[in-house]
Amino acid sequence: NLFQFTKMINGKLGAFAVLNYISTGCYCGWGGQGTPKDATDRCCFVHDCCYGRVKGCNPKLAIYSYSFQKGNIVCGKNNGCLRDICECDRVAANCFHQNKNTYNRNYRFLSSSRCRQTSEQC
């Protein structure tokens, strides 16, 4: 769920790091359209696509099991859609971490008018 995803992001990037990803680029935050602006925005695009493939539960609300082991996010013994949601969130949190050095503050709170290009397909 979104609370667990927040904890994953903060666990990988530090306390309150999630605040940098709430409204960044064209895809980080609610909804999304256009072309991802940078690697961070691409992480969000891929995460949105991943959630779109989940069947059988609501990715934003369903509670799954996971833990941090030696700094790595490990999804627990979840079944079906819970496993899929955990994997979506784990991959995105790792993606943010891998691209933290290219995070661009200029894309925070980006106007939707800058995201009007034809949206990419998942």
UniProtKB/Swiss-Prot annotation:
Keywords: Blood coagulation cascade inhibiting toxin, Calcium, Disulfide bond, Hemostasis impairing toxin, Hydrolase, Lipid degradation, Lipid metabolism, Metal-binding, Neurotoxin, Presynaptic neurotoxin, Secreted, Toxin. It catalyses: a 1,2-diacyl-sn-glycero-3-phosphocholine + H2O = a 1-acyl-sn-glycero-3-phosphocholine + a fatty acid + H(+). It comes from the Eukaryota. Ca(2+) binds at Y27, G29, G31, D48. SUPFAM superfamilies: Phospholipase A2, PLA2. The keyword Iron does not apply. It is found in: Secreted. Its cofactor is Ca(2+). Expressed by the venom gland. Pfam families: Phospholip_A2_1. Binds 1 Ca(2+) ion. One of its GO terms (biological process) is phospholipid metabolic process. GO terms for molecular function: calcium ion binding; calcium-dependent phospholipase A2 activity; phospholipid binding; toxin activity. One of its GO terms (cellular component) is extracellular region. Its EC number is 3.1.1.4. The keyword Calcium applies. The active site is at H47, D89. Disulfide bonds join C26-C115, C28-C44, C43-C95, C49-C122, C50-C88, C57-C81, C75-C86. Heterodimer of an acidic subunit (CbIalpha or CbIbeta) and a basic subunit (CbII). The acidic subunit is non-toxic, and increases the toxicity of the basic subunit. Heterodimer: presynaptic neurotoxin. Belongs to the phospholipase A2 family. Group I subfamily. D49 sub-subfamily. This is Basic phospholipase A2 CbII. It comes from Pseudocerastes fieldi.
